[in-house]
A protein has these predicted regions:
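Residue register of alpha-helical TPR repeats
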Residues: 9, 49, 89-95, 134-137, ...
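Core solenoid repeat modules with strong leucine/isoleucine-rich periodicity
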Residues: 500-609, 613-860, 865, 880, ...
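Amphipathic alpha-helical segments of tetratricopeptide repeats
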Residues: 32-39, 72-83, 117-127, 156-164, ...
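Short coil/turn connectors between adjacent alpha-helices in alpha-solenoid helical repeat scaffolds
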Residues: 16-27, 56-70, 85-86, 98-115, ...
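Internal alpha-solenoid helical repeat scaffolds
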Residues: 5-9, 26-29, 34, 38-165, ...
């Protein structure tokens, strides 16, 4: 706290500000400081408020030892000066007897007699105050359930009583009753009791997160697997990193351990490492540690005891080491509770959890399903391939010669040989063979550098690839191999050309590179056929890449000319790999030239050749291209078949014959065209994981971003959030080492998912942070405009209209630098509706100012469109949305409609209706109707027109009391829509007309 409050007004302001903070040490320390400040004032009432805030901070900050001490001070004040406590303060005081009971129960050092004495005091106080005793019996039952003695009687004494205003909330009592049935072994009855909470009908600060954590295993045991999965995702988010809900986190870890999700369990454990240090409640700590031990025990039993695990701060842990530590601490805590209670109940329940067998072998909890092998420090081993790779020779000379022979063919097994040789050469005791056939060590080092350069190129590290190829060329020169040197320099040219940015620059670089390549080729003599074919292929590739960037008709013929040279030469010398490679490039060139049928014909001929003559390892890549051509020809099913076959065949080959992640992404695209988005989502996440295993992290995170957006589009909000939470927790992302824009995109999608999941507070905080960061993106003001606009809408939904206006102004300023007409106009209209809806007439001027801004942006869009500078798609926000207000809700549809002018007119109508300016509203809505015109039988905006008519009828008939013209309008619209076959759209109009007639 910067400065202590100097008067009681400042104290109350500080207490209110602290109340808005999340529970934790910051809030608790501030509450302690405010109590110190309150003690300086002569008035005792501010001290009461400060003590109440401090007790709340201790209670929900998991510091049960301190809560009773604070309450004792409050009780003394009440006994000494009861008149200081108004009705609200008195209510809070008697409510918190239960908090103290709960706090004392969590402390094994408090004797059982002390707990019973407190319950007696609570009963006597309640009786003296004339309060019902149901809350007292509720606390007595909780103590009985904790000790395991006389539980049935205590339950009946509590559950049979009528609730009072001091009873715990419905959600908490539901959880308590359900847990009673759960302890008795009746899963079905427990779940039936829980249903209102699990369905979201009853909730509080701790619910449904607490109930969800207990219900997960019963749901599995009763076969409700999918619901358990969904509730795990939503429920975990409600308790993670929260010291007062450490037990709930422990049960989620246990759920992961018993469903084959041990890797996710370790990930969640790392996310909650703070709970080892921040949980001051022994009972909560025991609950958490037992869940941790269930997880670690399972991981260790699967043979992964040496995996790293996140544990108590101050040292590094393995799974086995942490399990031993956790077991010791948890056993000690359980023993202390049982000693206090005089029973073995706590230890017995702990043992029952540890003895549970897995309930499912493998439940796919999240879109990012990972195994323990995936989280191991060492690179995961590749899955066994159906095709058996040729054995790597044992003799060093044979191995070197074999690698070169395979490399000459372009065989995928080459990589395994080079990898083995790289390890051998790096050994301190390496001795190079004295074999003329093998050649000198410098030649082998050149070979290895060439392979390393190829790997860099596969990871799109073109600068590194170019440098390594040049270095390899120099070594080949030293070894007396000018042909190899020429190929390396040619490949370096290609890598350098990849580094150019922008289509024009890239085309120029590729043209120059081709000239240099031809000169290099012509100046190198004595080339063996396979090397000459490689140089010819490089020449054709450079021109093919130029065509890809320019799509210029004049660049088509030169590519085919080079390909003709390659095909003639490779056919004459029977260089099979370059024949098929050239034919593949020929098909690609036809596609780039816009002749997809010709491209498909070329591919079909090539596939026939490959199946009869080989090389077989070219089949996956060729099928992949064929699939992409089929997509271009609108045959998604044929494309899917080709991609699936390519993926199957690619698994038969080692190395990087074809990029499996690209094929998986292609499969996802085909699935989207086939209307199978859930399958597409699975392929996208597999593609991302494949890229991660290949250490292509940027590609992986881009694909994860696409998967997250798709899951959000599909309404799988919790899946989206869980996926992004996992990705954002990756070490390089968390450390800020990933590209900041890509990280921002991941966070932006997560913020949108939080909003869709109705976690408005978290979504607003993330959007505000992103808006602040993106304000510094001088090279990308358009993105800042979009983010700031979305932030403004969220702030408006939260009622923070001053901050919303600031964010909207930022968006408008950024929009001037990089126009985002559609997005910004949409946000401004939504803000107008929000402010008018929430503030009524008081908010009308500010709301109309937003619409004026939206109108100016619409004018800009129209001018830009007419000038050919931008194509701005108009949209109509008219939405047939149910809401409490007669004139609809503030939601703005993104459905495209007839005109932006119509959209603005409609919004003016809604905003003025919210602001009770009904004449202006009616005029605007009639204008919107006129601009829309009556829909025809095929128009898909009939529903929007009907909603506009309905709102006009509401304003005219209900608010302005002009029933007759309103009925005329409504009846005419119903007749028109019925005649067109739009019966569904007539229902709200007919309902409004009936209401108006009833009120006549």
């Amino acid at each position: 706290m910067p400065t202590a409050p100097q008067n009681t007004d400042e104290l109350y302001q500080a207490l209110q500000a602290n109340d808005e903070r999340p529970y934790g040490r910051t809030r608790t320390v501030t509450a302690e400081e405010l109590v110190d400040a309150a003690e300086q004032f002569e008035e005792p009432v501010p001290l009461i408020h400060a003590l109440l805030e401090l007790q709340e901070a201790y209670t929900y900050g998991s510091e049960p030892r301190k809560s009773p001490v604070v309450f004792a001070r409050l009780l003394n004040l009440f006994d000494e000066q009861p008149d200081l406590f108004d009705e609200r303060l008195r209510y809070m005081l008697f409510w918190r007897f239960k908090w103290v009971s709960n706090a004392l129960r969590q402390l094994p050092e408090i004797p059982l007699t002390g707990l019973n004495q407190w319950l007696t005091e609570m009963r006597e106080r309640y009786e003296k105050a004339g309060l019902g005793l149901q809350p007292y019996y509720g606390e007595a039952y909780q103590l009985a359930a904790h000790t395991g003695e006389d539980t049935t009687l205590a339950y009946e004494l509590w559950a049979a009583r009528t609730r009072t205003r001091f009873s715990d909330c419905e959600a908490c009592e539901i959880c308590r009753r359900a847990c009673h049935h759960l302890t008795a072994g009746d899963d079905e009855r427990a779940l039936a009791v829980w249903e209102p909470v699990l369905a979201g009908k009853e909730s509080c600060q701790e619910e449904p997160a607490r109930s969800v954590s207990y219900a997960l295993l019963p749901l599995l045991r009763t076969g409700r697997v999918e619901r358990a999965r969904e509730l795990h995702l939503a429920g975990y988010r409600g308790c993670r990193r929260n010291p007062s809900m450490a037990g709930e986190v422990g049960r989620h870890l246990e759920f992961c351990a018993l469903t084959g999700n041990e890797a996710r369990g370790l990930e969640l454990l790392a996310e909650n490492r703070n709970l080892f240090d921040e949980v001051d409640s022994p009972l909560e700590q025991l609950d958490f540690l037992t869940g941790v031990e269930v997880l670690l025990q399972r991981v260790e039993s699967l043979g992964h005891g040496e995996l790293p695990a996140a544990g108590h701060p101050g040292r590094t842990w393995t799974v086995s080491g942490l399990r031993a530590e956790v077991r010791t601490r948890a056993d000690d805590l359980a023993a202390r509770f049982d000693t206090r209670n005089g029973t073995t109940t706590v230890t017995d329940r702990r043992r029952a959890r540890l003895d549970r067998a897995p309930l499912l072998d493998a439940l796919e909890l999240t879109l990012r399903t990972r195994s323990l092998d995936d989280v191991a420090p060492a690179a995961p081993t590749a899955a066994p391939a159906p095709r058996t790779a040729e054995a790597v020779p044992e003799s060093l000379s044979e191995l070197i010669l074999r690698a070169r022979a395979l490399d000459e063919k372009g065989h995928p097994d080459t990589r395994a040989c080079w990898t083995r040789l790289r390890t051998l050469v790096a050994a301190p005791d390496y001795t190079h063979p004295d074999d003329p056939a093998v050649g000198p060590l410098v030649l082998l080092r050149a070979d290895l550098l060439s392979d390393e350069a190829s790997q860099a190129g596969e990871k799109d590290d073109h600068a590194e690839a170019a440098a390594l190829h040049e270095e390899a060329a120099a070594l080949y020169e030293d070894a007396g191999e000018p042909g190899h040197a020429a190929v390396e320099r040619g490949t370096a040219l290609l890598a350098e050309a990849e580094r150019a940015e922008g289509a024009e620059a890239k085309a120029a670089v590729l043209t120059d590179a081709h000239v240099t390549m031809v000169r290099l080729h012509e100046s190198t003599t004595g080339l063996p056929p396979y090397q000459e074919a490689r140089l010819l292929r490089l020449r054709a590739t450079l021109l093919g890449m130029r065509l890809q960037w320019t799509r210029s008709e004049e660049h088509i013929a030169p590519v085919f000319a080079e390909l003709d040279l390659l095909h003639t030469f490779a056919t004459r010398h029977d260089v099979a790999g370059q024949i098929s490679g050239g034919l593949l490039l020929r098909a690609t060139t036809h596609a780039l030239a816009g002749d997809l049928p010709a491209a498909l014909a070329e591919i079909d001929a090539l596939l026939e050749r490959l199946r009869s003559q080989g090389p077989d390892w070219h089949l996956p890549r060729t099928l992949g291209l064929r699939g992409r051509l089929q997509l271009g020809l609108q045959d998604a099913q044929a494309a899917y078949t080709d991609f699936a076959e390519a993926l199957r065949l690619s698994g038969q080959w080692q190395g990087d014959t074809i990029d499996p992640s690209r094929l998986l992404a292609d499969l996802a695209e085909a699935c989207m065209h086939l209307g199978r988005p859930d399958e597409a989502l699975r392929h996208l996440t597999r593609a991302a994981e494949t890229d991660l295993r290949r250490d292509r992290r940027i590609d992986a995170f881009c694909t994860y971003s696409n998967a997250a957006r798709l899951s959000l589009d599909l309404g799988r909000v919790e899946d989206c959030i869980a996926l992004l939470d996992s990705v954002l927790a990756e070490p390089d992302v968390a450390a800020g080492e990933l590209d900041d824009r890509l990280t921002a995109q991941l966070r932006l999608t997560r913020a949108r998912a939080l909003r869709a999941g109705e976690d408005l507070k978290a979504a607003t905080a993330e959007f505000a942070a992103l808006a602040a960061e993106s304000a510094g993106w001088d090279d990308d003001p358009g993105s800042h405009a979009m983010i700031a606009a979305e932030t403004a809408v969220l702030l408006g939904e939260s009622g923070e209209f001053d901050r919303a206006r600031e964010a909207a102004d930022q968006a408008i300023a950024a929009h001037r630098l990089a126009p985002r007409h559609e997005q910004l106009s949409n946000s401004l209209r939504e803000l107008a509706c929000l402010q008018a809806q929430q503030q009524g007439p008081d908010g009308l001027p500010a709301a109309l100012a937003y619409l004026a801004d939206a109108g100016r942006i619409a004018d800009e869009a129209r001018i830009a469109d007419e000038a050919g500078e931008a194509r701005i798609a108009d949209e109509n926000p008219i939405a047939d949305e149910a809401g409490e207000a007669e004139h609809g809700t503030h939601g703005v549809s993104e459905t495209r409609g007839p005109s932006l002018d119509t959209a603005l007119a409609y919004e003016y109508g809604r905003v003025n209706a919210y602001g009770r300016a009904y004449e202006d509203a009616l005029a605007a809505l009639e204008k919107a109707q006129a601009l829309l015109g009556e829909p025809g039988p095929e128009d898909d905006w009939a529903g929007q027109w009907a909603e506009c008519v309905r709102l006009t009828g509401v304003v005219e008939g209900l608010y302005l009391k002009r029933t007759a013209p309103a009925l005329t309008r409504l009846d005419a619209a119903v007749s028109h829509l019925t005649a067109l076959g739009h019966e569904e759209e007539t229902a709200p109009l007919a309902s409004l007309a009936a209401r108006l007639r009833d009120e006549e």
